[in-house]
Amino acid sequence: MADNQIPITQIEDGTVKQPSVWRNLLIDGLWKNNGALVQLLGLCPLLAVSNSVTNALGLGLATLFVLLCTNVTISLFRQMIPHDIRIPIYVMVIATVVTAVQLLMNAFAYPVYQSLGIFIPLIVTNCIVIGRAEAYASKHQVHHSAFDGLATGLGMTLSLVLLGAIRELIGNGTLFDGLDLLFGDWAKVLRLDLLQLDSGLLLAILPPGAFIGLGLILAVKNLFDHK
């Protein structure tokens, strides 16, 4: 079935029932068509910054915000954007939103901004963002496009956080360390010391550990999909 097509089902009284568009968008974004775990898009930031939950959540929320704003903007002006130059226009819209996100993180979450570094502006080139703009937002109404951006962003964020949690736990024995850098001093109480390690497995927080962790997550997801 083509991406984003809504299946039509027959019910007992002979009428045709169309499943909820919202439900399908949510399931696609979180599981069936997850940008990171199914389409394998945006792997560069996914692998590079997911060495802790804090970094993963910071980049995930930034990407979610960019997806949401970009989808809404492009859907609003979809009838006015010339078809022949639509891609450069999409990139300009994405770059504008990313610049705003970068300035906000610089002002309110500077340590995380420093930690993520170049990967915040690189959201501009993330294929997930421009892919949803081209495949969905440019063809659908604003409310559906906004929810598509939200669902896709949540799927990306959850993938990042899951990989970050695995790597942080194995590498440092902790979870949610440094979350106060994102949410303030109150978040210090969320830190969990789950494994009492004198020295964690360094491989887990290095790039090879990211590939191994992602491979394990993909294997588990495929196992569930084929049951």
Curated annotation (Swiss-Prot):
This is Ion-translocating oxidoreductase complex subunit E. Belongs to the NqrDE/RnfAE family. It comes from Haemophilus ducreyi (strain 35000HP / ATCC 700724). Its EC number is 7.-.-.-. Keywords: Cell inner membrane, Cell membrane, Electron transport, Membrane, Translocase, Transmembrane, Transmembrane helix, Transport. Part of a membrane-bound complex that couples electron transfer with translocation of ions across the membrane. The chain crosses the membrane at residues 57-77, 89-109, 111-131, 146-166, 200-220. One of its GO terms (cellular component) is plasma membrane. It is an enzyme of class 7 (translocase). GO terms for biological process: electron transport chain. HAMAP family: RsxE_RnfE. The complex is composed of six subunits: RnfA, RnfB, RnfC, RnfD, RnfE and RnfG. It is a multi-pass membrane protein. The keyword Transmembrane helix applies. Its main location: membrane. It is found in: Cell inner membrane. InterPro entries: NqrDE/RnfAE (IPR003667), RnfE (IPR010968).
